[in-house]
Amino acid sequence: MNTIDKKQSLGGFEKYLPLWIPLCMAIGVLLSLYTTLGERIEALAIGGISIPIGICLFFMMYPAVLNLKGSELRKLKDNPQPILLTLFSNWIIAPLVGFVLAKMFLSDHDELFVAVILLSASPCTAMVLVWGSMADGNQEQNVVNTSLNTITIMIFYAPLVALLTGIQNIEIDRWGLAISVLVFIGLPILAGLLTRKIVIPMKGETWFDETYRPVLGKFSIISLLTTLIVLFALNGNTILGSPEYLLLISIPLLLGFVIVVGINIAMTKLFRLKYREAAVTVIIGSSSHFEIAIATAIAAYGVGSVAALGTTMGLFWEIPIMLGLVYLTRYLGRKNFW
């Protein structure tokens, strides 16, 4: 098994995300019981969009799109097979598996059904750079795939979500869905491109990659955890009154992950990918962009909705599961599976 020269790892704070996430959920529930934070946040809104949540969502998304490098897309022609397999998994396999499982377990719970679709139809563009590096995967392929995901999510996400929810006869504001994608992905992409255009000529690409992006990455995680606290502060009564919602959505999410990972491992074996390419394909093809799923759920159903609450469970499970997947791919690599 080959390794890359410079391997990324989670920082001290990020290593404990599996602890911070449930802690923030608990803090949010306690705040809902003993304070009026939820009501005050709901009052800070313009046109139905919560200003504090909007700020948090922007800083969740903005650091991720700083990874977008148009120049990297030219490398697609060098070794297209693993990249195309990853796109196939992201846009065909994962959404279909999510739809089937949501139909099996959540047919009577429209907002939870939508939450599963929002998660399964959103390929990751940020954390997979770290997961792929920790697995000693091909980082050039990783950057190309995340750049492609950033672009394709602008094109395919809203139509795919509308299609899959429409098959289930769930009414969703399609224009609102498209607008939320433009706002919560389009604006951060624009800001990211402008940042690269302005900052790199001034400070250099090394400073941008090694100093600026890591600092913004901290803002992303803090914004993510703040959003969790707010969401659970607004949904505390719902959670305590109906804790089965969290269990209900966890079943298709966990089953879906196992199925999609299994398909991706089999697919990379079938197409005889080498370890470094297979690891990245499995990791990216099996991950979700929980930030855009949360943002879209809030835009479509409101900050205090069951749909928004449901998408947070994608985040709850994603971090520990992806860490486990890193260890699984490394184990398979040591056993010369690929």
Predicted regions and their residues:
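Alpha-helical transmembrane segments of multi-pass small-molecule/ion transporters
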Residues: 1-66, 71-286, 290-338
